[in-house]
Amino acid sequence: VTEFKRALPNAEIFASSNDQDVKCHTRISQFAIERAKRLVECGEHVFMLIDSITRMARSFNNTSKNNATMSGGVGVGALEIPRRLFAAARNTRTAGSLTILATALIETGSKMDDLIFLEFKGTGNMELVLDRKIAEQFYYPAVNIFKSGTRREELLLQSFQLDKIHMLRSE
């Protein structure tokens, strides 16, 4: 957080550290998204980084008052607010835009983490998968190009770039 504040002096940084209680995590999450929405309404283009959506969802799960649980120990309705927060990303025609980039914990061995990931996987429009084996070989960024991609990538890339990516993925 300190490094972000130093590197981005004009940015608003909202953070909640591990030593704070879950109510603080949920309160900051909701405050940050509401602030972002107001800026978009004023015509600003906002970029929000959520690290991690898994931890944020866990916090909302821990503050959930519902005793009924789904598989993985996630409370019924516990993901409703995190889903709404993540769904706030948009590009408006008359005002600004809100882009949300969220990290997710995967392959942790936790059924809850798997359920949270699957809940948000279909909501996003791109997925960037990092690979530990690539990082161990000191290649950075350690992106797994076979598991990474975006919806409608043909709108972002020139045809020759898209052809090369498809060729790489087919190998």
Identify the meaning behind each predicted range.
Residues V1-E171:
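P-loop NTPase catalytic core
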